[in-house]
Design a protein with these regions (language model features):
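Glycine- and acidic-residue-rich phosphate-binding/metal-coordinating active-site segment common to enzymes
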Residues: 121
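A conserved ligand/cofactor-binding region detector
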Residues: 1-117, 125-128, 135-210
């Protein structure tokens, strides 16, 4: 692990999000997840604040390259989502292109109001995206089931959503998902990304190492 490059990246990302430092954590945790082999890719947005975009700082892509990561970027064709420039980061160009392709298919399978238009494509796209992002299969499966069946967000669901990071954990396998994904990522963040760890630990409503 190139600790020096990681710290330089963290510094630049937090400088960009200086007004709302908590917004820096998704980028850094996504990159860390790819670096430790927990997830094949990460999906981010080229955010814009005060007229400047994250990747206007040309040093950031150079550091990602230094870390052995590939960066792809692009916009979706659907008007509702075209205003965002999406960033696809992974260890190979092929993985980034896979994520980009499946995210395009996902966006085309829903309406502007979020209604599923093509159930088969929507389900396949979510399964593929979940796998490319390294999410536990049990969590992806429950998310798909709840959406397809139109289940309400009950108290149990909202409590799981409130205490966990990264993705929506399933009801039955929440603990296994946490220990197989969240905990491993959080331990790496604690070791390599001090600013990110500080911000994440400050949110006492979210699980950290237990």
């Amino acid at each position: 692990m190139n600790r020096d490059a990681l710290l330089r990246l963290e510094k630049l990302v937090f400088e960009f999000y200086w007004k709302r430092k908590n917004l820096a954590t998704p980028f850094m945790t996504g990159v860390m997840g790819v670096l430790i082999g927990l997830k094949p890719t990460t999906l981010q947005v080229n955010d814009e604040f005060d007229g400047k975009k994250l990747l206007d700082n040309e040093i950031i892509p150079k550091i990602l390259d230094e870390l052995g990561l590939v960066l792809a970027k692009g916009r979706l064709r659907r008007a509702q989502m075209a205003k965002y420039e999406y960033l696809y980061v992974g260890k190979t160009k092929e993985l980034c292109e896979d994520l980009q392709g499946w995210y395009e298919k996902f966006s085309n399978s829903i309406s502007d109001e979020g209604k599923i238009l093509d159930r088969r494509v929507w389900i396949e796209a979510n399964n593929q995206i979940g796998e490319l992002l390294g999410y536990p299969k049990t969590a992806t499966a429950e998310y798909i089931r709840r959406q397809v069946e139109g289940l309400d967000m009950d108290d149990n669901y909202m409590m799981r959503l409130g205490r966990n990071n990264y993705y929506i954990h399933s009801e039955k396998f929440e603990e296994e998902e946490f220990r197989g994904y969240d905990l491993l990522l959080n331990l790496a963040i604690k070791e390599y990304l001090p600013k990110t760890a500080e911000i994440m630990q400050s949110n006492t409503e979210k699980r950290w190492l237990e």
